[in-house]
From Swiss-Prot:
UniProt keyword ATP-binding, yes or no: no
Protein name, entry field: Demethylmenaquinone methyltransferase
Keyword annotations: Menaquinone biosynthesis, Methyltransferase, S-adenosyl-L-methionine, Transferase
Catalysed reaction equations from the record: a 2-demethylmenaquinol + S-adenosyl-L-methionine = a menaquinol + S-adenosyl-L-homocysteine + H(+)
Role: Methyltransferase required for the conversion of demethylmenaquinol (DMKH2) to menaquinol (MKH2).
Family recorded in the similarity comment: Belongs to the class I-like SAM-binding methyltransferase superfamily. MenG/UbiE family.
MF terms (GO), sorted A to Z: demethylmenaquinone methyltransferase activity
Entry EC no(s): 2.1.1.163
Length: 238
């Protein structure tokens, strides 16, 4: 099999290969912090029973599940991802938890298959850095969220603390691929993940991108010395 030629093909290849070890590696890479980041973000979102959400690049479904538990049986959550293997893990979790309000869809974040103004919330967790075009996906999420709704992104960021920054880059460049090789047998795939994290915009740059996509207001929150950040974009009420 030849080397994937585009970013989209390369990312698809990565996640189709690491899906079975993704959850355990995610916990190791973030020192278990990703769960607390998502929990804090959910608190800030204040999701209510009966509401609707779309989780873009849902992967193995952890954020989709948190959203499903928040909206309850009267709400609706759709988790969308382009990796069928990642979705297979999410489907097993859904079945185990009997979450009838959760629907899992194989689809493309660059062309969301939904009408304008469809969801109260649209989320993307650690997926934006992997899409071919950040702005296209932000504009798509803006399009499908309802007026007065929120688009929320949790993503790796560029640390600003002196010393912390150097340690972060060392960890991502040298340690993470080795962990990937030892645990997931996937050195090349985890090398890609550190590349995508290194090249991703800082939190201020991402805030500007949210505003350029049309959002009326954007809130930011840094986590763990700036290694990750939450951006919450508000779509103006009509």
């Amino acid at each position: 099999m030849g080397k994937p030629s585009s970013k989209e093909e390369r990312v698809h290849h990565v996640f189709e290969n690491i899906y079975s070890k993704y959850d355990s590696m995610n916990s190791i890479i973030s020192f278990q912090r990703h769960k607390s980041w998502r929990k804090d973000t959910m608190k800030r979102m204040n999701v209510q029973a009966g509401e609707t959400a779309l989780d873009v690049c849902c992967g193995t479904g952890d954020w989709s599940i948190s959203l499903s538990e928040a909206v309850g049986q009267t709400g609706k959550v759709i988790g969308l991802d382009f990796s069928k293997n990642m979705l297979s893990i999410a489907k097993q979790k859904k079945q185990d938890l009997q979450l009838n309000q959760l629907e899992l869809v194989h689809g493309n974040a660059m062309e969301l298959p939904y009408e304008e103004n469809s969801f109260d919330y649209v989320t993307i967790g650690f997926g934006l850095r992997n899409v071919p075009d950040y702005m296209t996906v932000l504009e798509e999420m803006y399009r499908v969220v309802k007026p007065g709704g929120k688009v929320v992104c949790i993503e790796t960021s560029q640390p600003t603390l002196i010393g912390y920054r150097q340690a972060y880059y060392f960890y991502f460049k040298f340690i993470m691929p080795i962990l990937g090789k030892l645990i997931a047998k996937s050195y090349k795939e985890y090398s890609w993940l550190q590349e995508s994290a290194k090249d991703f915009p800082g939190k201020k740059e991402l805030k500007e991108m949210f505003l350029n996509a049309g959002f009326d207001k954007v809130e930011m929150k840094s986590y763990t010395g700036g290694v990750a950040a939450m951006h919450m974009g508000f779509k103006a009420s009509q």
